[in-house]
Amino acid sequence: MKEVIMKKKIFLLTMIVGIIAVIGACKKSDDSTTTAACSSSLSTTASGTLTGMTSTMGVDNMTGTYNLAWYGATPTAGCIDNVTAVSSMINQSAVPSDTQNFKYQHIITSSTSFTELLTWYSDNNSCATVSGYHATSYTNFTVGDNITMATAPSGYPTYGTKVSYKDTCFMAKGVTDTATAFINAMSNVSGAVTGTELNKEGSGSTYYNIMALNDNHSGTTYDWFYLGPESTSAYPDNYSSDDSDVMYQ
């Protein structure tokens, strides 16, 4: 699980850089219409329900916020403060160098959308002092067929639901100068100013993936969410040990 999640973080960061490379060709932030459209479509407030995912209870729904399960653990409120984990993320340039804790979350924002949010914190072991964040909004969420697998990577179920969603909006903000420098170091991102939120149109790409739920997994009170390796060309037929996520709420 350690290697799975670490590789996924590298994959996500690479994907985000690719997204930004595309949106660099979009209208500049001084176009008020473009900025407003992006801002209005990117919410980090949980609202609504995504329906139709397969689960241990048959068909189930997703609502609220799901947090990354790091090293197989379920840290309080999703605050990942494992020193080894944070150090590894810094060494791989996946988070700013002043990061002490972080959260990686999927937030259901309507019946057809969700937001992927990575927040960095500069305080020690509490996730109280935000140093920065970046988020991507996905809309046009659509549920397809259910699938099963003969086997799946360790920690993942042998079932899933085909889903698709569109990359609509990207935003980022550095509260500390270190976080701002990290954002500006992303490919085709410039002009981020400490304390000011940067909003950009997304790539517009449609992604194909598989998702599944597992209620009260392993006798715990948590509901678990599994997200496969997304693609712009075809639905995956299984989860991946390199670039899939295990999340909980």
Where are these regions (language model features)?
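Bacterial Sec-dependent N-terminal signal peptides
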Residues: 7-10, 21-60, 249
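General secretory precursor processing signal
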Residues: 29, 39-43, 82, 130, ...
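Short, Lys/Arg-enriched N-terminal segments with co-localized hydrophobic residues
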Residues: 1-5
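Sec-dependent N-terminal signal peptides
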Residues: 12-16
